[in-house]
């Protein structure tokens, strides 16, 4: 694996790659407030060992990429999609498979709408529609416990790394599915990396200021790339119905249901996820 910082769209974006650059590329795009460390290193290596060139990167305002003062609202999800395409440019990759989780899945959808010529396939994990063809669609909201947890963060002493680590671990616990074992040691190690790597940890909350874009209403039907939707039945952040909505709106899509999984990329599911992704991406 090799970590590199590139100047992309005039800003620093931190990336890391796994595997042989000559292999077909899979770009991993993580969700809101989370850096690339939440794509577990072992997961990336397992994916690369199947014959893929795997790239993960820090979105704006997390990890070692550019950060802005907390409370700053100066970019859009579309800008983040352009960053993802810029990562492909930086690695001199003409076309790639995109794999996005949560907000990363929405970034992936926008990239597919704006740059279809760059996309081989899409994989959308624990995410939702960027814009619906169905104006009457009423998708279930995020669990109140998660919203309360986020609200409690405003009273936290963010200078105390131990307090912050405990808070972030407890947030991950809320996302774990009822039929998955929460591995506190694993999550703590991720959180520790997150805290130590961050240029400005509090800047991650700028992602909460991102707003939807009406320009993407009713455009999902235009996505032609084969799409694999992966969703847990016990997702408390974006309930299972969000995954079903994607299947309903993206023409060439299939669903992998993770029974009892939450809003997570849980190690118990890696074998099924990687098998499905390899089968999905090998068709192109």
Language-model segments: which ranges?
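Flexible "cap/lid" loop of the alpha/beta hydrolase fold
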Residues: 122-157
């Amino acid at each position: 694996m090799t970590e590199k910082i590139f100047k992309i769209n005039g800003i620093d974006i931190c990336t890391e790659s796994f595997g042989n650059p000559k292999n077909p590329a899979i770009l991993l795009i993580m969700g809101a407030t989370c850096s690339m460390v939440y794509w577990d290193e072992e997961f990336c290596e397992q994916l690369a060992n199947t014959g893929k060139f795997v790239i993960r990167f820090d979105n704006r305002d997390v990890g070692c990429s550019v950060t802005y003062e907390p409370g700053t609202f100066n970019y859009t999800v579309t800008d983040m999609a352009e960053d993802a395409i810029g990562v492909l440019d930086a690695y001199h990759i003409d076309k790639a498979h995109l794999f996005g989780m949560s907000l990363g899945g929405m970034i992936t959808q926008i990239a597919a709408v704006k740059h279809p010529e760059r996309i081989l396939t899409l994989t959308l994990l624990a995410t939702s529609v960027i814009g619906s063809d169905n104006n009457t669609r009423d998708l279930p909201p995020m669990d109140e416990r998660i919203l309360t947890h986020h609200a409690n963060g405003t009273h936290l002493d963010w200078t105390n790394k131990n307090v912050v680590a405990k808070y972030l671990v407890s947030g991950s616990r809320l996302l774990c599915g009822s039929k998955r074992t929460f591995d506190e040691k694993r999550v703590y190690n991720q959180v520790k990396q997150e805290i130590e790597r961050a240029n400005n940890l509090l800047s991650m909350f700028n992602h909460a200021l991102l707003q939807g874009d009406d320009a993407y209403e009713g455009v999902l039907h235009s996505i032609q790339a084969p799409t694999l939707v992966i969703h847990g039945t016990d997702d408390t952040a974006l309930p299972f119905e969000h995954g079903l909505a994607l299947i309903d709106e993206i023409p060439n899509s299939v669903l992998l249901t993770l029974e009892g999984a939450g809003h997570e990329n849980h190690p118990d599911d890696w074998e099924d996820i990687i098998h499905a992704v390899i089968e999905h991406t090998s068709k192109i």
